[in-house]
Amino acid sequence: MALSFFICNFVNVKIMNDMKETNNYYCVILAGGKGRRLWPTSREQHPKQFIDFFGSGQTQLQQTYERFAKILPKENIFVNTNINYLNLVKEQLPQVADDHIMAEPIHRNTAPSAAWATHRIRHINPTASIIFSPSDQTVMNEEAFKQNVIEGLQFVEENDCLLTMGVKPTRPEPGYGYIQLGERAANDVYKVQSFTEKPDREFAQVFMDSGEFYWNTGLFLANVHCFYESFSKLLPTVLRKLDTENPSFSIEDEDNYVKENFPSYPNMSIDHGILEKSENVYVMKCDFGWADLGTWHSIYEAMQKGEGDNVVIDSDVILDNSHGNVIKLPEGRMAVIN
């Protein structure tokens, strides 16, 4: 009886500690991209993150949300998007509160988006650790992904640094960014030596053969203090005005202020605006079956091939002497490919 009571209490304490730990962890899903490179399936008015690309019953955005909802408290998940996609986000994620959907009035890439989200989360929880995630990635091993995310958040919680997640290249892919590993810092975490964005195929082959380069997944982590200091230093026009104009903004005031001032913010990615200009940047070696749905070529390379080395995505087709194609048809359509 006493042993059972002890085990019960031990389990309860562990659950409470785990809950307390993850309460400081936040995710911001970046869902404002136009998805032009996957035309005609993805179009500016309805880009790829809002499409059920593989016939799974969920769009890429919904899959991303559910992936993080298994790791973090749902109330700690935010979505950043463009005002043109606000209704799509609300339709596809009705469980997300309005004040957790941050809609920009104009496209300004990911750095201003992340700075704004950092400002909002900092006012909610000044001890938060944050992961920024694209909304259009494929993850084959969700258990490994969960483990890597938790380990990454624990690392940045304890260290004032920026952390990106890297995966080992499986092919010389010119459409991805590459991270060169430097000195080892802890377990699978290394200092970043350099970033290279979309090299040509010859250099991508050299990178892969060297073993020193990993693909950049676009997953970025840091504690809120480190993110805030980095954005304040490198993108001062974004955060400084938000805090100095009126640090006690309500959500509505903040949204109105951003609507008025966002067009003046620089058009810059997190990679170029923050990571490549910072000294304290690290990369974690990860292996969770990652693929980026950026281009038709990257999809072809990542997907399993069928007859004639064709990739057929949720489509009804008849193939006749066809090789090396990516085929995705609108629902209800049939095609003969020759």
Where are these regions (language model features)?
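Hydrophobic alpha-helical signal peptides and transmembrane signal-/tail-anchor segments
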Residues: 1-11
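Conserved N-terminal catalytic core of the sugar/cofactor nucleotidyltransferase
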Residues: 9, 15-29, 37-44, 55-134, ...
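Left-handed beta-helix
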Residues: 12, 17-24, 225-338
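Short beta-strand segments
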Residues: 29-31, 80, 131-134, 164-168, ...
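General beta-strand structural signal in soluble alpha/beta enzymes
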Residues: 79, 102-103, 132, 163-165, ...
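Conserved core of the sugar-phosphate nucleotidyltransferase
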Residues: 142-262, 282
